[in-house]
Amino acid sequence: MLAELDFDNIPNLKYIDEQFLDPDYDPGGKHSVPYTWGVVGLFYNTDYIEEEITGWDALWNVDYAGKILMFDNPRDAFAIAQFRLGQSVNTLDLADWEAAADLLKVQKPILQAYVMDQIFDKMESGEAWIAPYYAGDAAILVENSDSIEFVVPEEGTNFFVDAICIPVTSSHKREAEEYINFLCDPEIAGANMDYVGYSTPETAAKEYMDEEVVESPIHYPSEEVLANTQVFVNLPEDVSKRIDTLWAEVKMGGPGESAVLVAIIVGFLAVYVAIILYKRHKRKRELA
């Protein structure tokens, strides 16, 4: 449970841009303060991929088979398929989720791996050529490599906000609120953004940031790009459970392939048991 914040202790909230103050995940903004934000995009190695990448369909390109990485978490992975299909990432229609799962199953044979933080090592070394990831982290890789490019796919993408909250059980709530207030100071927010790589929800902080960062389309995408984003919301339990089941099927190869695997295991065990029983029976005859 999260504590309701006392904003008398957070006067610097006034520097947070208005568009961040009434989020879907915290109506009225009573329990959280926006800390950073970003989008999801694709980064790719131009040493191996010469054509310009513009859309999520690149993650299904057989020319890159064995060199494609994919998110190892269901919400982000499904979202990519949903953007390709023109769906809402918050759809309540189970048929939509099943269609997205089918698309992910089509992709699986050409993937190198489902990964998260390992993306950095694999992309830097050239072991992988293309991968989706969060813009703030991707920017670091782009800055450190002349051959890595980043793009926000034209079909749209996820917009996310990291927020600061205080547990209702906190015994130092006032001190925590004062710390949040410190982080909301524009100069501190600007320095923090330069360090962590994720965009600050404070326009006033840009005055204290490197000009290259402020003008970077990775850190601060255009209004046109931002208008084509969607924000995740919590889904009903029945939908969440179905997503978990579908994700397991995607990772395991689908219900049909899972059934084959189970049949093979059962067959192996049957043969093993038969051999054991035969040996026991043979030993009894020899002793007799």
What role is predicted for each listed range?
Residues 1-4, 26-29, 140-152, 212-217:
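Ligand-binding "clamshell"
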Residues 42, 159, 185:
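Binding-cleft/active-site segments that stabilize strongly anionic ligands or cofactors
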Residues 97-106, 144-168:
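Periplasmic-binding protein-like
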Residues 124, 130-147:
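A ligand-binding cleft/hinge motif common to bilobed small-molecule-binding domains
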Residues 167-227:
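Mature extracytoplasmic/periplasmic domains
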Residues 223-288:
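Conserved C-terminal helix/tail region of periplasmic/extracytoplasmic solute-binding proteins
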